[in-house]
């Protein structure tokens, strides 16, 4: 037998060893594939977790500062239509409706093609109006996004970000957005400020400047945050939200999101680079129209 020719026993042993190594490598490959699949699943989880989202635009005619605000024309279209058209561009929403207690607003919205849900005049705020509208919807939704009707330039990306952040934070029942606070807005009580923790969860909201240093002046080097008027709710939580009793901080600041925090619930916050362009008073309309002209928005 040639020296280099293996015996039958050694051939079997070599073959067995090779097979073992193949199975080990195969097992490692399967393990790596399984790990990769698990990571991919976690990354893609938003497509299955809280997957269905509805955008609700609460609108009321009565307002102490600006009566009939939803119907005010902005470059030829009612403001509520401008807002609805922007919201319809959000890719994360399965459905968009306007919730109102005023037939004038409802008729206007139906005229440009929006779905409308009539709600009672007893709703204390937009969140309660969204809750009532949610209960009247035929389909089930996991997330409800409350988009204020006086945001004719709202960016669809903000809506998508609010939805995605709630999908990726199972311990949160509420999500919202902030942007950088402009120095001139530091002490404007109509501009709500926010502070967040290192994980992106809300700590507090205030009409005053927060954090507030002992000098009593705004720190030009500190990245203060401005709260944007958008809220994403876990639909189960939204249904119980109106039943939660008012809280001291909520009533003192007149900020409904504080009721969420004071009752021990978690709120996810995303930071965006878009400015706030809400219409709070009649003089804001001209500013919005000028901005739209510069952006060539028809």
Swiss-Prot record:
Pfam families in the record, alphabetically? CTP_transf_3
Q: Which subcellular locations apply to this protein? A: Membrane
Which EC class is the enzyme in? transferase
What main location does UniProt list? membrane
Give EC number(s), comma-separated: 2.7.7.38
Q: Is Chaperone among this UniProt entry's keywords?
A: no
Q: Which GO terms describe its biological process?
A: cell wall organization; CMP-keto-3-deoxy-D-manno-octulosonic acid biosynthetic process
Say if the entry is tagged with keyword Nucleotidyltransferase.
yes
| Keyword line | Cell wall biogenesis/degradation, Magnesium, Membrane, Nucleotidyltransferase, Transferase, Transmembrane, Transmembrane helix
Cite the annotated pathway: Nucleotide-sugar biosynthesis; CMP-3-deoxy-D-manno-octulosonate biosynthesis; CMP-3-deoxy-D-manno-octulosonate from 3-deoxy-D-manno-octulosonate and CTP: step 1/1
- Catalytic activities: 3-deoxy-alpha-D-manno-oct-2-ulosonate + CTP = CMP-3-deoxy-beta-D-manno-octulosonate + diphosphate
Looking at the UniProt entry, the stretches that span the membrane are 22-42
Disulfide-linked positions: none
Gene Ontology CC: cytosol; membrane
How does acidity or alkalinity (pH) affect activity? Answer: Optimum pH is 9.5.
Q: Which Gene3D superfamilies match?
A: Spore Coat Polysaccharide Biosynthesis Protein SpsA, Chain A
Q: Which cofactor does it need?
A: Mg(2+)
**Record's bilayer topology term:** Single-pass membrane protein
- Give any GO molecular function from the UniProt entry: 3-deoxy-manno-octulosonate cytidylyltransferase activity
Q: In which tissues is it expressed?
A: Ubiquitous.
Q: Which family does it belong to?
A: Belongs to the KdsB family.
Q: What does this protein do?
A: Catalyzes the production of the sugar nucleotide CMP-3-deoxy-D-manno-octulosonate (CMP-KDO). CTP is the preferred nucleotide donor, and it can partially be replaced with UTP but not with ATP. Activates KDO during the biosynthesis of rhamnogalacturonan II (RG-II), a structurally complex pectic polysaccharide of the primary cell wall. RG-II is essential for the cell wall integrity of rapidly growing tissues and pollen tube growth and elongation.
HAMAP family reported for this sequence = KdsB
An additional note in the Swiss-Prot or TrEMBL entry is: Rhamnogalacturonan II (RG-II) RG-II is a structurally complex pectic polysaccharide present in the primary cell wall. RG-II consists of a linear 1,4-linked a-Dgalacturonic acid backbone with four distinct side chains, two of which contain apiosyl residues. Boric acid forms a diester with two apiosyl residues from separate RG-II molecules, thereby covalently cross-linking two RG-II molecules as a dimer.
Record's protein name: 3-deoxy-manno-octulosonate cytidylyltransferase
- Gene source species: Zea mays (Maize)
């Amino acid at each position: 037998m040639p020296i280099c020719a293996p015996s039958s026993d050694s051939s079997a042993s070599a073959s067995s060893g090779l097979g073992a190594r193949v199975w080990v490598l195969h097992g490692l490959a399967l393990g790596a594939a399984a790990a990769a699949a698990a990571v991919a699943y976690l990354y893609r989880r938003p497509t299955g977790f809280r997957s269905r989202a509805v955008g609700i635009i609460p609108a009321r005619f009565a307002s102490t500062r600006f009566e009939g605000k939803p119907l005010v024309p902005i470059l030829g279209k009612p403001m509520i239509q401008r807002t609805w058209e922007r919201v319809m561009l959000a890719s994360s929403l399965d459905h968009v409706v306007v919730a109102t207690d005023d037939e004038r607003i409802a008729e206007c919205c139906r005229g440009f093609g929006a779905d409308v849900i009539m709600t009672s005049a007893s709703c204390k705020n937009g969140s309660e109006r969204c809750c009532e509208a949610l209960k009247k919807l035929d389909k089930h939704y996991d997330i409800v996004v409350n988009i204020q009707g006086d945001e004719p330039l709202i960016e669809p990306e903000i809506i998508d970000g609010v939805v995605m952040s709630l999908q990726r934070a199972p311990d949160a029942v509420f999500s919202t957005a902030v942007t950088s606070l402009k120095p001139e807005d530091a002490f404007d009580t109509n501009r709500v400020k926010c502070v967040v923790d290192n994980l992106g969860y809300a700590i507090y909201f205030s009409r005053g400047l927060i954090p507030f240093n002992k000098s009593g002046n705004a720190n030009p080097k500190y990245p203060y945050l401005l709260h944007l008027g958008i809220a994403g709710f876990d639909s189960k939580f939204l249904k119980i939200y109106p039943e939660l009793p008012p809280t001291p901080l909520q009533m003192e600041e007149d900020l409904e999101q504080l009721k969420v925090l004071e009752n021990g619930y978690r709120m996810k916050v995303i930071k965006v680079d878009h400015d706030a362009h809400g219409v709070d008073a009649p003089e804001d309309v001209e500013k919005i129209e000028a901005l739209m002209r510069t952006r060539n928005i028809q």
